[in-house]
UniProtKB/Swiss-Prot annotation:
This is Mu-theraphotoxin-Hhn2f. It comes from Cyriopagopus hainanus. Lethal neurotoxin. Selectively blocks tetrodotoxin-sensitive voltage-gated sodium channels (Nav). Does not affect tetrodotoxin-resistant voltage-gated sodium channels or calcium channels. The keyword Signal applies. GO terms for molecular function: ion channel inhibitor activity; sodium channel regulator activity; toxin activity. SUPFAM superfamilies: omega toxin-like. The keyword Metal-binding does not apply. The lineage of its organism: Eukaryota, Metazoa, Ecdysozoa, Arthropoda, Chelicerata. Keywords: Amidation, Disulfide bond, Ion channel impairing toxin, Knottin, Neurotoxin, Presynaptic neurotoxin, Secreted, Signal, Toxin, Voltage-gated sodium channel impairing toxin.
Amino acid sequence: MKASMFLALAGLVLLFVVGYASESEEKEFPIELLSKIFAVDVFKGEERGCRGFGDSCTPGKNECCPNHACSNKHKWCKVYLGK
């Protein structure tokens, strides 16, 4: 009984959101709605200034992230263990 009530309520909420979104003329409405619901801006990508584990690199340049080092043999960043 509780599960069916929850399912019915979730269906009504979904129907309301879809109906409201179809009336909206803005193309970015779903992204704006989700960012307001979760109060985070996860839809904008961020560029990292360094290269992480397994990324290609050039030995001698400081391209890898902290605690990583560029392997002279394989030419990719790997974890630096301090040896």
